[in-house]
From Swiss-Prot:
Protein name, per record: Putative thymidine phosphorylase
Catalytic reactions on record: thymidine + phosphate = 2-deoxy-alpha-D-ribose 1-phosphate + thymine
Entry's family note: Belongs to the thymidine/pyrimidine-nucleoside phosphorylase family. Type 2 subfamily.
SMART domains cross-referenced by the UniProt entry: PYNP_C
Native species: Legionella pneumophila (strain Corby)
Length: 517
């Protein structure tokens, strides 16, 4: 790589070569989405360029170029003249063993100066937001730099206008779907509530009515199952954009993994960094939800906000603030948003974990006598709100129409058709190991800690092991006898079952029993 500049007489003068060549060795190190370059401590390039640990380095291979963070190797893992890359960087450069890469100092980042602007409390323009989001997506900003932007944008530091600009920048960073129908409905749940798997019931009800509902869902980020994980136990969810379109045009709806279609891709990077610093900011949450809905091509969105002490939204005032933001920013960007505040005090249904949640969904769709009523009622409320987006449905009548579609068996028939169109319906699997957890005394269930219950389900192997998780037998307000099962842990391996049981011994207050009144 040469830098050139004009001499006084107008001729081009080549500066000395500032990029250095190193031979690639495949190390097979996974860093998730972070680009890392590994170089020897005594590497001649490190010395001549002044590269130190954590330096950001421009790495070029043929037509591909990325910015990676330097990690220094002090062992014989690399031979002199060799460099290694994290798997993410290796794939981004389309690298092969023995390829020669060029390394150099990157140009100063304009986006970083805009991050500083935000840190000092100034408002950002759409253009500045767009530069930041583009650099997030291309990997030019490191995770540390992204976390500085997220922190500077949290705790109400983004104005309503900035949230709108950020949302727009995130939409513009990826693809945007368009559909043959003038009315396209979407639904979303803000989250934090185990077992709240209403999507798999809402989509077939709305599609059976005749409205278009192309649903892209996420896999679990910190929960025991995401909607895509649960759906995957029943049908393929990894569909190309072309296949997704085919399913929707044929059946009016789909339930697919959003990661396979490039909608608001910068959001996935921001969520990953937010998770690492355990940060949930209202502005980012609004931009995240709305950018995904608008990129999907939705004209109307129904958003479920569960409110409870151990849900994502902990109290009514937070919920109302979020509701107002979602509706106002959505309106500015041409999306009609209906928000519904729901009870987030305890898990929904009986199952927590992909297969167990799918079992609950199937029992509701099939109208079985043991179907969880709370899951059914929530799904009907949300489906009713979605149906009322249509001028054919009078306000207030949506839920009863949704109920008719569910009880007639049309929703189950539509769900089967969607599964077939996505690649074929699958049989649910059962876990090999189970362990019941019983009540130490008689009493009435007064509190269930969603977060601790979700943690046990994850230790048992969910969502990676599809059949792992928890089967909840007691809900808030129900009386139990001493020795009666409160919940059963399901696991694919005895080792994971033991992990989950170990946590139980540490955390006795997962389900709190009060006196029977």
């Amino acid at each position: 790589m040469h830098h050139s500049f004009l001499s006084a007489n107008g001729g081009v003068v080549m500066s000395k070569k500032t990029a250095h060549g190193l031979r690639l060795k495949h190390l097979g190190i996974k860093t998730y989405h972070e680009a890392i370059i590994y170089m020897r401590e005594d590497c001649h390039v490190c010395h001549s360029e002044g590269f130190e640990v954590q330096t950001r380095i421009q790495v070029t291979l043929g037509q591909h170029s990325i910015i990676a963070t330097l990690n220094v190797v002090t062992s014989e893992l690399l031979a002199p003249g060799e460099a290694g890359l994290s798997d993410y960087a290796w794939d981004a450069l389309h690298a092969k063993e023995g390829d020669e890469i060029q390394v150099s100092h990157p140009k100063p980042l304009e986006s970083l100066s805009y991050v500083h602007t935000k840190i000092y409390g100034n408002e950002l323009s759409y253009e500045q937001m767009k530069v930041i989001i583009d650099d997030v997506l291309s990997g030019r900003l490191s995770d540390v730099q992204i976390s500085a932007f997220l922190a500077a944008s949290s705790a109400g530091r983004l104005t309503r206008t900035e949230i709108m600009k950020l949302t727009k920048a995130m939409i513009d960073s990826g693809d945007r779907l368009s559909w043959s129908s003038p009315l396209v409905v979407d639904k979303h749940c803000v989250g934090g509530l185990p077992g709240n798997r209403t999507t798999l019931i809402v989509v077939p009800i709305v599609a059976a009515f005749g409205l278009m509902i192309p649903k892209t869902s996420s896999r679990a980020i910190t929960s025991p199952a995401g909607t895509a994980d649960t759906m995957e136990t029943l049908a393929p969810v990894h569909l190309s954009p072309q296949k997704m379109r085919q399913v929707v045009e044929q059946e009016n709806g789909c339930i697919v993994w959003g990661g396979a279609v490039s909608l608001s891709p910068a959001d996935d990077v921001l969520i990953r960094v937010e998770r690492a610093i355990d940060l949930d900011s209202e502005g980012q949450l609004v931009a995240s939800i709305l950018s995904k809905k608008i990129a999907t091509g939705a004209t109307h969105a129904v958003i479920d906000i569960p409110v409870g002490p151990t849900a994502k939204v902990r109290n009514q005032s937070m919920a109302l603030l979020l509701k107002q933001s979602l509706e106002e920013v959505g309106n500015e960007l041409g999306l009609v948003v209906h928000t519904i505040l729901t009870d987030g005090s305890q898990p929904v249904g009986h199952g927590i974990g992909p297969s167990l949640e799918a079992r609950d969904v199937m029992s509701v769709l099939q109208g079985l006598p043991d179907a969880p009523n709370d899951l059914r009622e929530r799904a009907l409320t949300l489906a009713g709100a979605a149906l009322e987006c249509s001028s054919k449905v009078q306000p207030g009548l949506g839920k009863s129409i949704a109920k008719q579609i569910l009880e007639s068996g049309k929703a189950f028939k539509k769900f089967q058709a969607i599964c077939e169109a996505q690649g074929g319906m699958r049989e649910l699997t059962k876990a090999r190991f189970t362990h019941p957890v019983v009540a130490a005394k008689e009493g009435k269930v007064s509190l269930i800690d969603n977060r601790k219950l979700a943690k046990i389900a994850k230790l048992a192997g969910a969502p990676k092991s599809k059949s792992a998780g928890i089967d909840l037998h007691a809900h808030v307000g129900e009386s139990v006898e001493q020795g009666e099962p409160l919940f059963t842990i399901h696991s694919e391996s005895s080792g994971e079952l033991n992990y989950a049981c170990d946590l139980l011994r540490d955390k006795q207050d997962i389900i709190i029993l009060g006196e029977n009144s």
